[in-house]
UniProtKB/Swiss-Prot annotation:
Gene Ontology CC entries for this record: cytosol; glycine cleavage complex
Stated name of the protein: Glycine cleavage system H protein
Residues in Lipoyl-binding domain copies: 22-104
Organism from which the protein derives: Oleidesulfovibrio alaskensis (strain ATCC BAA-1058 / DSM 17464 / G20) (Desulfovibrio alaskensis)
Classification via CDD domains: GCS_H
Phylogenetic placement of the source organism: Bacteria, Pseudomonadati, Thermodesulfobacteriota, Desulfovibrionia, Desulfovibrionales
Disulfide bridge map: none
HAMAP family named in the record: GcvH (MF_00272)
Length: 127
């Protein structure tokens, strides 16, 4: 399973790529594998404010529905609109074409995990 070392991860399986005061957010490869083929993604709009740890949207798949939780606080600056018509991009490329949001960060959740810590988390959840 691909767990990019340069990313941070939440316990609810969102990833964050911090780029200065901006963050790119998506869901992990593990999350999309557990959900199966995504059929619908609900995301906040540009200009909306996120609070770390609070709900920021949801995803639906052929198997399940799941809430998405903000790994950072801040203002949404961009939403990947391509996902409205092609939610399967998250299944095909969760860390690249399947990114969900860009956020101007005001605070980062203190509980974000390194790639190594996240690998241990999913290993424990698998058993």
């Amino acid at each position: 399973m691909n767990i990019p070392a340069e990313l941070k991860f939440s316990k609810s399986h969102e990833w964050v790529r911090l780029e200065g005061d901006e963050a790119v957010i998506g869901i992990t490869e593990f999350a999309q594998e557990q959900l199966g083929d995504l059929t619908f993604i609900e995301l906040p709009a540009a200009g909306d404010t996120l609070t770390a740890g609070e709900e920021m949207g949801s995803v639906e798949s052929v198997k399940a529905a799941s809430e998405l939780y903000a790994p950072v606080s801040g203002e949404v600056t961009e939403v990947n609109l391509h996902l409205e018509d092609a939610p399967e991009a998250v299944n095909e490329s969760p860390y690249d074409k399947g990114w969900m949001l860009k956020v101007k960060v005001s605070a980062v959740a203190g509980s974000l995990l390194s790639a190594e810590e996240y690998a241990a988390l999913i290993e424990s959840e698998a058993h």
